[in-house]
Amino acid sequence: KENGRIKMVRISDIQDNKVLWDTVPFCDIDEESIETYLLKQNDILFARTGGTVGKSYLVKEVPKDAIYAGYLIRTRYSNNLSSEYLKFFMESDLYWIQLRNGTVATAQPNCNGKTLANMLVPIPPLAEQKRIVAKIEEIMPMIERLTQR
């Protein structure tokens, strides 16, 4: 929809870990529901169904008020868990193995909040999480260069 009250992020609007804000459509939503679905910095969105089930996105910034589509799951975490650390976990084999084991295999594979809540996530102290994130961010450009060869 080209006009409406508020932008609604869909999984198809997320490419290369960025929201393509120009493609995000507007939607109409009642005032009482906006706060429930409003995106905030450090939220993590998960695709709950289809070919992208399990794909995740860390919301680093929300340049304008936006909500998330119903086929996404939004999660928020305590201050004892780095959202960047959790995002890297969601790119790990351990995450994908657990997700596949908890995904309902139908014509359209899907998972739900319970699948995510039941996952075992290694959670070191916050300072260690930050060191892990810094190290991964340091070596990622090198890994990307090597995989392009």
Spans of model-derived segments:
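Short coil/turn segments at secondary-structure boundaries
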Residues: 1-4, 23, 101-103, 148
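Sequence-specific dsDNA recognition surfaces
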Residues: 12-41, 61
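Short Ser/Thr-interspersed hydrophobic loop/turn segments at strand-loop and sheet-helix junctions
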Residues: 7-17, 38-55, 69-73, 77, ...
